[in-house]
């Protein structure tokens, strides 16, 4: 009979099989009330599942991350329960957990309106407030198929036919008269599922295949308590205010249009930000001793076949043909960089060779996934590839890590989560090579005092990698930076160098990206700063305004003087009230507004205001220029007097 070992090392002995709920009840009624599920020998199980042998057990509650996921998954079933009551002929497809919530794909003979979604959410609350028990039943494959066939649930039948082995025993979860199929676990009672909200609907093809029927996807969010739900909704509200698409339109940065889906039309101010970002990255490339190169954006398909991209990536590649040759528009820069490396004989003395490019890449992303600057088809990578020997890996990775943190800190990103992905089952190279490569990455992180977690088996077949995920002011995660070792591509493309022993050797290639996509990073920055870009990045840094026509000449003189000092400045000489001008440029998020009246003309000074409404008073013009130059040169995140 089972001996149950708890996380604190204590043991409980039973003379019969017990469930996690039984053990929780044995410990105390408070824990039993909080028990959502159990973790038995590392595996999540339902609170009702029996433990027949000795086991390690953790009780899962709403305070655990897994508990919250289970709540969200059960809310998806609750959605199914409600929609079948409101529209009984609905066919249910899949309802998984996603970040911060869940969704369910449904086949419904009507297009859901906002009023329908509100009615659906209301019914979900009515059902949840009944606090009914969720009943789990393990059945044979044939019984599960018969259950769903009798209910007309063709999508569930399809899942059973195509994805579940006949000797498997699927789990059925009964919500009163509603039944769903799932691996589980799920909440034992609906009292855990009171804090949710339906968010939106969208179209989604069955199994993600555009040849299949378009279903309706209903998104929701769910949390353990009301406070967490409200905090999340508040973050969403703030995120909506910061939406880069909205701000991009307000500030006239860029636009997208149907004739070029996923391609950016940069306007003058947006392109100014893009170019300033390039200048910043270039300064770091110089500091860290990179070459900058430029490869063609289109190359023969034969090259992509050699690299393996054609076999694994062709659906995401744009192609064209000319003179009976097929070309691929590059989705990435690495093959082109190997071609540059291959020009001329290389010696070990030439290594490491650090090659960077602002590479214009294109990927045929599904149209439904396109999202402003965050998900595009045409983008620019701040890409680099380092060719080095195995002995140089650690030092080069060290340099990449320092560069990542150097650049992210410039934008004020302080919370960065780092993950090290290790060897997958299918891989090339010897275990010794992988041992050394993984150790090199780990030691480089440790030497920089960077905490990290392992993602076991998540590396590419050609090498391990480090991923850098930054968190913004709303605590949203953005995976941007990568340092990826590659033991395959140089060999596939015949890259070599002459070693100290005069023998030809294949270099190791390190793929390195920091911002990732320039377009996406500008989207991230737009939302991080809510359009209040730091002065060095702002498209227009200063606007000089007159109060009456008598100051126009002085304004023009000052405008020229600031422009000559390298400051992006505009004059506003319109015949409008000064309050109107200030409001307008404040809404345009211009960092500094300089106001000229008769007093300023007489004194040769200038009145300085910030976009946050702070009046810095009258200042000497040369002093203003000097302070602005210092702020811009240092790429400060703060404005004068902050």
UniProtKB/Swiss-Prot annotation:
GO molecular function, one term: threonine-tRNA ligase activity
Residues of the TGS domain: 1-61
Presence of keyword DNA-binding: no
Stretches for region Catalytic: 243-534
Compartment(s) of residence: Cytoplasm
GO cellular component terms attached to this protein's record: cytosol
Main location as per UniProt: cytoplasm
Described purpose of this protein according to its UniProt entry: Catalyzes the attachment of threonine to tRNA(Thr) in a two-step reaction: L-threonine is first activated by ATP to form Thr-AMP and then transferred to the acceptor end of tRNA(Thr). Also edits incorrectly charged L-seryl-tRNA(Thr).
Protein name, entry field: Threonine--tRNA ligase
Organism: Escherichia coli O157:H7
Name of the gene: thrS
